[in-house]
């Protein structure tokens, strides 16, 4: 009852129904509204609301569902009322093994402008073309790296710290951050920024990617830090699978990366991590996935259950968290349609599946930040990767705009 009238408007009633079941259709909601509004005044009073529990409908409410609903209501009070979307560009590529990811953010943004898919803040309050740009250190590539098992960690730490501050400030200003990332290493900064803005909230992460990205300098076979963001964010070293010995300088910088925005501890718990489409992993990562029983909704799950059901399973796994961060690495898609990325992998999801997956996730009011990364125009053919990514980006912006109750211009 947002306006304190003592009754639920049709919109308030609809929001409640969607909290219980994010996959319910508009027609199903309309039918339930017709049943509930007994006197036809366009509002649902207390007696009418209680009576809805006796109706035959597709909506089943359990005690567990009510507990989850209580947590969702708290999130509506705390973080769901964003005033608009803020676009943040972090075009860093030092964490990757190839070059070109730094061009991905600009390519996606340019494609959006050309297709008039970007929203203009001045006209409708949804998405500003004047994006926030995090200063990067890509110039350091020309000088080479000093840290064998955490390449460019000295420069990346600076980028991660800046990303932390920008994301935190954006959230504190009541804006929904949509992050356009270069390589995936900077996701550690995004996560730290969320935690900095909401230090007392329990954070969950949905990691949509072909790779687990949970190596540490102790376990990495390559030293590329785009494979380490989750180990940074969860303060995980995985010493049981150690193959590398670190020098004191690398170790000191690594500990700083693990404490981004914190005095101590981790930015989120590894138990509050969910994978989607992860399929190209290594032994050290498999050990962590098995040890911590990290849920991985595979491409096969997406095909057999449907992307919307998979999204719902992810949300159910994270029912105990207060906030959710969703990050989408384009290599989660099948290599036949995403060669424009540094580490493509076969047996991935397709564009329509990615759209539905992200759209369903974003209906949950606990989702407070979304990120897309690893687009590499230098490896692309006929701009396929950028165009596919643009379709997903448009879907996401529309989904967020619907939550903000605004109608964006396209």
For each feature predicted by the language model, list its residue ranges.
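Short aromatic/basic micro-patch
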Residues: 7, 43, 267
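Conserved tryptophan-centered aromatic signature that marks the ligand-binding surface of SH3
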Residues: 4-7, 31, 40
